UniProtKB/Swiss-Prot annotation:
Catalytic residues in the record: D10 (nucleophile), D12 (proton donor)
Organism: Homo sapiens
Record protein name field: 5'(3')-deoxyribonucleotidase, cytosolic type
Family the entry assigns: Belongs to the 5'(3')-deoxyribonucleotidase family.
Location in or out of the cell: Cytoplasm
PANTHER family (alphabetical): 5'(3')-DEOXYRIBONUCLEOTIDASE, 5'(3')-DEOXYRIBONUCLEOTIDASE, CYTOSOLIC TYPE
Single GO MF descriptor: IMP 5'-nucleotidase activity
Keyword terms: Cytoplasm, Hydrolase, Magnesium, Metal-binding, Nucleotide metabolism, Nucleotide-binding, Phosphoprotein
Residue numbers carrying Phosphoserine: S182
Role noted for this protein: Dephosphorylates the 5' and 2'(3')-phosphates of deoxyribonucleotides, with a preference for dUMP and dTMP, intermediate activity towards dGMP, and low activity towards dCMP and dAMP.
GO cellular component: cytoplasm; cytosol; extracellular exosome; mitochondrion; nucleus
Enzyme Commission numbers on file: 3.1.3.-
Taxonomic lineage: Eukaryota, Metazoa, Chordata, Craniata, Vertebrata
InterPro entries, sorted: 5'(3')-deoxyribonucleotidase, HAD-like_sf, HAD_sf
Amino acid sequence: MARSVRVLVDMDGVLADFEAGLLRGFRRRFPEEPHVPLEQRRGFLAREQYRALRPDLADKVASVYEAPGFFLDLEPIPGALDAVREMNDLPDTQVFICTSPLLKYHHCVGEKYRWVEQHLGPQFVERIILTRDKTVVLGDLLIDDKDTVRGQEETPSWEHILFTCCHNRHLVLPPTRRRLLSWSDNWREILDSKRGAAQRE
């Protein structure tokens, strides 16, 4: 009997368009302040790039994503919802949404659950894994826009597939790392390669 391939899919920047929502919210709330266009975003933490632009902007940009309604109102990444549904329907495949809440979690946790229910349905709500440390979660693949995922486990069970986002598209990955350019890229090929490896175990 074939072993199932378990795919962990990050939420912000992979399923939900965090970066576009943040820029839109920042410009709406602070129209007179300088902002970082998406094509100039560098580094996973927007707060740090805004801090480098001007120190007081760090708290201002954080206030946007810490506000009620921010996570709930994020638009889906193009193709994400269809891809995850299709992936979940594949034989011998388990899909979980693996997402990290903010430290100021008061609004984001509930809104992440509501976002998933609204866009993917209640069956995916049961597949949410909420954790600050993704390295301790067992899986075969982690699709995530964060370029480096660290935690308690130095060698996590999953292979990290870097999902291309505005803040990481400039990074050159070593030959051993794989990247998914978008949901129209060939994610099925990545799953098939991992499935073949699982069957040889």
